């Protein structure tokens, strides 16, 4: 890795900051929503109540001796952080720890009636079945009239913005983008991305998924298009091995999304059928590596995952959390070169992300100045700006 100055690791110890608000407000709200969405029994509800107290007022308590992943979490820093306030350990670590403890509270890992039951599934399905999803899927029919390269770019736009990619993933905002004082897309390496997926020769794409539901659907549409038009020969979709960060995609969520597409009419149904066929013949593979839920940056990835990424023509990492893990969850100066902080990555990498946390690299100085002048610091966390960054 190039010799770049170290930036402070983000912790959530300062009231009024975005990370502090996540631990102090968002996590308790998630616990209350989980208890409301699913009729858990008294044991699970007591455990959720205890977690609410612990995550806001208590300290990191190690997993029970019999936990199936205790050794893994010990290697990931559990014992080193034991006894410390959740606000005093790295923010990425405390967030990941919260979701591991939530699953422990609802009996997700233990033998019994709640084993394997996703506590976030009601919210995921509600989004996938929402009328807005019907409208977006119906709008796919209009893409059939576009040339292939325009269709591909529209689908990339949809994958970038997820459920903010309104009106069927159309690129209708492009003209406004070019004249806006502060563009929604604060960094755009999309031409470099397409140069890696030009089909000469066609190779493999790794896509590290972010959210399920209406955000996973456009990821799957993009993969289906790239396969159908020979831009890639196969795709590997990395999902989470268990529920994580409320909406992160698991294998079950992929199957739900494919079923949703297949049941639709028109172009959406055709995409769904192609995806089913690709899963069946191996052109689309699913991976659920344990490190996908690690509280660590990708710089610490194990060798087998490193090999997966090294063998791909391009690895696309979706979403804010994957970006934090890709560049390191630190207060980087926004103009820190993206290529420098990702130099360790074993192959070409592309980040597609809407901005929902303080971590940002690779901005032009004039872009940072314009953003700060127009919005103060809100642009970092509001989700109204996005980026496409590529390192080859």
Q: What residue spans do the PLM features occupy?
A:
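Non-catalytic accessory regions outside enzyme or core folds
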Residues: 1-191, 195-202, 385-392
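C-terminal functional extensions of proteins
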Residues: 2-4, 11, 239-241, 248-392
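Conserved structured core elements
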Residues: 21, 92, 187, 216-220, ...
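Gly/Ser/Thr-rich loops at beta-strand to alpha-helix junctions
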Residues: 89-93, 208-217, 242-244, 320-325
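Residues at the starts of beta-strands that form the adenosine-phosphate
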Residues: 203-204, 232-236, 348
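Structural motif
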Residues: 204-206, 313-314
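Histidine-anchored nucleotide/phosphate-binding helix
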Residues: 214-236
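N-terminal beta1-alpha1-beta2 submodule of the flavodoxin-like/Rossmannoid cofactor-binding fold
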Residues: 227, 240-243
